[in-house]
């Protein structure tokens, strides 16, 4: 896969493309895309018997403060094949910190042209409360049994915060 050939999206930051690395509900394995080789690599086996609460991946041509492309959790119920690209609408951000520093997760839903299921979801606060609790619980505990690793959940950011975060990540990648 030539990641350079995949666009950020047709109208960033309102919609962005996400390259999926880990499917919702899959085995507790963390995959990461080798950005230069375009190959999906097994990063690690999760020590906790937990599954991702959404399809997880990154936005190409972005750079977060940790030096990686920005992470995205796509809130939908159908597992996507790792390596596929899905167009999404960002609705919020879960602000976290881990043993490596600040680590934000964009929360998004599939774009309306893919499914109408999420067309009335515009902000993370439109999601069911239990979904938000499950997302926070997963990220707070998925590294629990890994030696030397920890995660602290901070605040949630709204749709505007997510858009601002994406714009900054695009600019950071351009300046690299």
From Swiss-Prot:
Q: Which coarse location class applies to the principal site listed for this UniProt protein?
A: cytoplasm
Q: Which cofactor does it need?
A: Mg(2+)
What UniProt keywords are attached to this protein's entry? Answer: Cytoplasm, Hydrolase, Magnesium, Metal-binding
Q: Which PROSITE patterns match?
A: PPASE (PS00387)
Binding, Mg(2+) 2: 71
First-tier enzyme category under EC:
hydrolase
Q: Which HAMAP family match?
A: Inorganic_PPase
Identify this protein by name: Inorganic pyrophosphatase
Whose protein is this, by species? Brucella melitensis biotype 1 (strain ATCC 23456 / CCUG 17765 / NCTC 10094 / 16M)
Gene coding for it: ppa
């Amino acid at each position: 896969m030539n990641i350079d050939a995949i666009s950020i999206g047709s109208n960033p930051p309102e919609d962005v493309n996400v390259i999926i690395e880990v499917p919702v509900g899959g085995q507790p394995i963390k995959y990461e895309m080798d950005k230069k080789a375009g190959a999906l690599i097994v990063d690690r086996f999760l020590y906790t018997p937990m599954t991702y609460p959404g399809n997880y991946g990154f936005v190409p041509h972005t750079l977060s403060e940790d030096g990686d492309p920005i992470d995205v959790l796509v809130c939908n119920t159908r597992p996507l094949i790792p390596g596929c690209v899905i167009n999404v609408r960002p609705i919020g951000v879960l602000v976290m910190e881990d043993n490596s520093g600040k680590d934000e997760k964009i929360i998004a839903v599939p774009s309306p042209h893919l499914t109408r299921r999420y067309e009335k979801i515009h902000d993370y606060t439109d999601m069911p409360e239990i979904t938000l609790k499950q997302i926070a619980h997963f990220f707070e505990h998925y590294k629990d049994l890994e030696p030397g690793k920890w995660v602290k959940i901070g605040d949630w950011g709204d749709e505007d915060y997510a858009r601002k975060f994406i714009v900054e990540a695009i600019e950071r990648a351009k300046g690299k």
